[in-house]
Structure formats: C-alpha cells, structure tokens
Regions:
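C-lobe/activation-segment region of protein kinase-like
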Residues: 59-62, 129-142, 147-158, 166-241
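Conserved catalytic motifs of the protein kinase core domain
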Residues: 36, 106-107, 174
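ATP-binding glycine-rich loop module of kinase domains
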Residues: 21, 26-81
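Conserved structural core of kinase catalytic domains
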Residues: 89-138
Length: 241
C-alpha cells in the first residue's frame, strides 16, 4: 500500500507508542501516519479509562461471553461498502480507507487525515463551537454534507459534533467530513434494505443534529471542567501536526 520507512518501523510494525495522538475518542486513539502525513491510523484503546462497548449477540449469551466491539473492523467494512457503491466520490465528505496495518499498539486502520489548506489537521465542529464559531456561517457546509448523505443513502448514527471535521479551503471554502459514526444501529436494518426509508432516516438525523449543535454552543461548548473529568478528548485536538 505505502512504502514504509525503516526509521519509523521495526519488523514491518509501525511505531506509534512514543507519538502523541492528535485525537482521543472513547474507544480509539488517532495518530498521524509516520510515513504518510496525509493519512492517519486509528487504534483501539487498551487503557482502563476507555469506553467499553460489548457486541450485541442477543440475550442468548451472557455478556461476559461476548467480545468487545471492534470499531475499526466495523468502520472498515462500512467504508469499503460505500466505496464499492460510489467510488472516489465518497472522498468529498468521507475519508478514504486503506485497510489495516500492524503497529506497536495493535492493529491499526489507515484512513485519510482531513487537513486545512495550510496543512494543519482540521478541527472538529465541537472544537469550533468551543472556540465560538458563528454556526450560521457554516450551515451551508452542513447542508452540503446532508445532501451528499441523502443522495447516496449513507446511513449514520446520531450526527455528533465531534464526529464532524471542518476543513478550511484556500479560497475560504468550508467542507464537512464525517470522520466517525457511519452506519445504522437498528437491529432490523430496514433503512439499509430500502433506500427511500434510508433517506427519510438520514434527513431525520440531520434535522435533529442542528438544534443540538446550537444548544451546545449556547452552553459554551467544552469547558475545562468537562475536559478534565472526561475519559476522552472531547473532540479537542491534542495537536495539529
């Protein structure tokens, strides 16, 4: 896939442990790929403060028998499915997926890393809200994302501010990328089977998201106290390198 630099790998295992992740979610940490800065590597967190989510297998099996949910495997499957459906068009609002690599922190998923025109890692909407952005100024960009999701029947879970990266273009353009949260959590995936139902569901998610963003902005965004008590990064970048 990508040439590996012997200075950053050992026995074809990419070294990440001594690097600082630019983003930390409840279950995963995101690192700049040490060989290709246009890509990132997502690895599952192993620390005790991570959010644990157990795979749903119904009530036939005790919870202790079920495996911990693998976000990476799920995301790779969904992004590959979208790519087989619409090809490179997905790159207008979604990261392209490049499969798995071995790292010293476990198996990692390689994806496009969304950056601004100046090369810095793009901030999440959650971080922009915390910085006091005027939401109305970016609503057209959000509408463009919504139209894309509806047009291609790309289902999402709740559309959350920390799962949206806002890329700033050279001419002042702004583009939203959905960097997490794709898929349908429904036990019976009717919205996947019937595109008209899927489009209705997507629109409902979009309609619910914007008022939630406005309410969060009114509350002042991520406070120092919230971030201090949190087991994840609250959508705030640790660096933009």
């Amino acid at each position: 896939m990508m040439d590996q630099d012997p200075q950053t790998t050992a026995n074809n295992i990419i070294q990440l442990a001594n690097s600082t992740p630019f983003g930390v979610g409840g279950r995963r940490a995101c690192y700049v790929h040490p060989v290709d800065a246009s890509k990132c590597i997502k690895v599952l967190r192993q620390d005790e403060r991570r959010t644990v989510r157990i795979q749903k297998k119904g009530n036939l099996f005790p919870k202790s028998w079920r495996r911990e949910y693998d976000n990476n495997a799920h995301e790779e499957k969904l992004l590959s499915r979208i790519h087989s459906k619409i090809g490179s068009r997905m790159a207008s609002h979604l990261p392209m997926c490049y499969g798995f690599v071995s790292t010293d922190l476990g198996r990692g998923l390689v994806l496009d890393l969304i950056r601004d025109h100046d090369g810095k890692i793009s901030r999440s909407l959650r971080e922009w809200i915390t910085l006091g952005i005027d939401l109305e100024s970016i609503k057209p960009a959000f509408m463009n994302l919504g139209n894309f999701l509806i047009e291609h029947s790309i289902l999402t879970r709740h559309i959350l501010d920390h799962n949206l990266a806002l890329s700033l273009g050279k001419s002042g353009s702004r583009t939203f990328y959905l960097i997490d949260g794709i898929g349908d959590a429904a036990w019976l995936p009717l919205a996947q089977w019937f595109p008209p139902l899927g489009r209705i569901k997507i629109k409902r998610k979009l309609d619910a998201a914007w008022p939630r963003f406005k309410a969060f902005a009114t509350s002042g965004g991520v406070t120092g106290q919230l971030k201090e008590k949190s087991s994840w990064g609250q959508g705030i970048l640790q660096h933009r390198g």
